[in-house]
C-alpha cells in the first residue's frame, strides 16, 4: 500500500447518498486514502467515488458486527473516521425498529475501535430527528431541547451521547453533524424530493401524507459536503455540533406544487391519510454555524 498518504480515512455508509458524496469529496484529494465500508443494505456500489488517484478502497462489511469492522481497523491505521452508516428513511425505520436499534452496536464498535487505534477524530452523521417535534424555531444546536421519541431519533441522540462520553472519559475528539433534509442526484427514489421529481417527470400522481401543511427545509448535497469538508480541513467544530441544512422553510404541499410547475408536469396531487407517527409538523434549523463553515453571510 502507498505509504505516502497523509490521511487514512474510514467512511462508513460510504455507498449511500450522503456518505458516497462525502467520500468523493475526500477522494478528490490525492493525499487521502479513503476506505469505504458499507453493507449495501440500502447503499449501492454504483455510488462509489470515481478518482484517478487510486486512493479509494471499498469493503463490504457491517459496522454493527464487531468482527467485521475490527478486522478493518486492524488492517488500516485510520487517522479519521466518518461514521455515516445507518438505516434511513421514515417508513423504513418505522417498519424496522429493532434493526434501527441495532445501529447502536455500530456506534459502540466504531468508538471503541477508534479509541484503541489512535484515531484523531470521529465525525458523526446525526439528524434533525433528534429534535423530535421541536419546541423552538429555528432549532438551535445548543438551546433547543432534544425531543427524541422514535427509535431512529433515539439512536441518533444516544449516538451523540456516546461521542461526548468517549471524549470526556478517553479524550477521543468528535464532531457531530445534524443533517436536515438533503437532496441531490444520488438520492434514493423513496425520499420526498426525488420521489416527487420522479412522479412529476412521469406525469404520475404525487402523493402527500396528511394535508401537506408540514414544513421542511431542503439542502442541496454540495452545500452539505462543502460544510463538512470545511470543518474537516480547517479543524473546526472540534467536540462540537452543527446543524447542516437550509433555513428556507417550505410546506410539503408547496414543494409538490413547485415541482409540478418547474417540470411542466400534468401530475395531480393526491392526499393520503397522515402517518400515525414520524411526520413532524415543522422543521427549520438555525444554520448560523453552517454559514460560518461555508463563509457565507446569507
What kind of feature is each model-predicted range?
Residues 1-182:
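N-terminal Rossmann-like NAD(P)+-binding domain of SDR-like oxidoreductases, especially those catalyzing
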Residues 22, 228-232, 256-259:
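Hydrophobic "lid"/C-terminal helical patch
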Residues 64, 95, 102-105, 150, ...:
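Residue-level signal for the nucleotide or nucleotide-sugar donor/cofactor binding architecture
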Residues 68, 109-113, 218, 223-226, ...:
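Conserved mid-core alpha-helix of short-chain dehydrogenase/reductase
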Residues 157, 182-195, 202-204, 209, ...:
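Glycine/proline-rich active-site loop of Rossmann-fold NAD(P)-dependent oxidoreductases
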Residues 158, 162, 166, 196, ...:
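Hydrophobic alpha-helix immediately C-terminal to the catalytic Tyr-X-X-X-Lys motif of short-chain
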Residues 211, 239-242, 250-257, 264-282, ...:
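C-terminal "lid/loop" region of Rossmann-like NAD(P)-dependent oxidoreductases
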